[in-house]
Amino acid sequence: MKLAVFISGGGTTLHNLIQHRDDGHLDVDFKLVISSNPNAEGLKYAEQAKIAHQSVCRKDFSHAEAYRDAMFEPCRTAGIDYVLMGGFLQHVLIPEDFTHRVINIHPALIPSFCGKGYYGRRVHEAVLAYGATVSGCTVHFVDDQYDHGPILLQRVVPVEKNDTPEELAHRVFVAECEAYPEAVRLLETGRVRVDGRQVSW
């Protein structure tokens, strides 16, 4: 299965996925990494793993459709089966031929604490401020709205008394490091089906 990874920052999700592949837990071929930020630290992981990589900046395009094409045409050329978003913060439209072929991981239990502006520390601050007793992560298919597509899988973690955003973020990230590879393994089976908002395998 040929994969592309979209990133914007430090690349911790990309690094985790590469490690799972190298450890034999994922039978995938990372063909391409595309960053929305030419200075993203995560590009070093692509370089170290000898994965083709490039940056495509939204500000270089006058409209959303042109940016969409610039992001996905390299994926078509590389024969990509699925695109994985890992800390990708730039909104991008999903072309019709990539419907249900792009997945993202969000550090909360969608449909709570998600949507535009909910990323990184902000998510965990919101969870704590609301008084939620659980949080977690969600792997979902991506559509044209933020954090909106059908849910592939979720993992739950407790919110502990007197948690800080950093402590909760760490607990959620540990769950993410297992959930995303698990989601990729589900896609590897070829059995995943999407019917409206319902996902089965």
Residue locations for each model-derived region?
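One-carbon transfer enzymes
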Residues: 1-201
